[in-house]
Amino acid sequence: MVWSRGQRRKLALENPSMQNSEISEQLGCQWKSLREADKRPFLEEAQRLKIL
């Protein structure tokens, strides 16, 4: 969620005609392609927010 919020806005601005479902699909592909090291800060932030 933490990663996708910022990415969703960026993708929507870059592709104004893209449907929300298409954006979600694209975000899923992008997330899966990230290395674990690149995902780690977002996963840690999500965990921190979950505790609050």
Swiss-Prot record:
Source taxonomy: Eukaryota, Metazoa, Chordata, Craniata, Vertebrata
Residue ranges of DNA binding: 1-52
Gene: SRY
GO biological process terms held by the UniProt record: cell differentiation; sex differentiation
GO cellular component assignments: cytoplasm; nuclear speck; nucleus
Main location: nucleus
GO MF entries: calmodulin binding; DNA-binding transcription activator activity, RNA polymerase II-specific; RNA polymerase II cis-regulatory region sequence-specific DNA binding
PROSITE patterns, per the entry: HMG_BOX_2
SUPFAM superfamilies named in the record: HMG-box
The protein's name in its UniProt record: Sex-determining region Y protein
Its biological purpose: Transcriptional regulator that controls a genetic switch in male development. It is necessary and sufficient for initiating male sex determination by directing the development of supporting cell precursors (pre-Sertoli cells) as Sertoli rather than granulosa cells. Involved in different aspects of gene regulation including promoter activation or repression. Binds to the DNA consensus sequence 5'-[AT]AACAA[AT]-3'. SRY HMG box recognizes DNA by partial intercalation in the minor groove and promotes DNA bending. Also involved in pre-mRNA splicing.
Keywords: Activator, Calmodulin-binding, Cytoplasm, Differentiation, DNA-binding, Nucleus, Repressor, Sexual differentiation, Transcription, Transcription regulation
Family per record: Belongs to the SRY family.
Annotated Pfam families: HMG_box
Assembly: Interacts with CALM, EP300, HDAC3, KPNB1, ZNF208 isoform KRAB-O, PARP1, SLC9A3R2 and WT1. The interaction with EP300 modulates its DNA-binding activity. The interaction with KPNB1 is sensitive to dissociation by Ran in the GTP-bound form. Interaction with PARP1 impaired its DNA-binding activity.
Subcellular compartments: Nucleus speckle; Cytoplasm; Nucleus
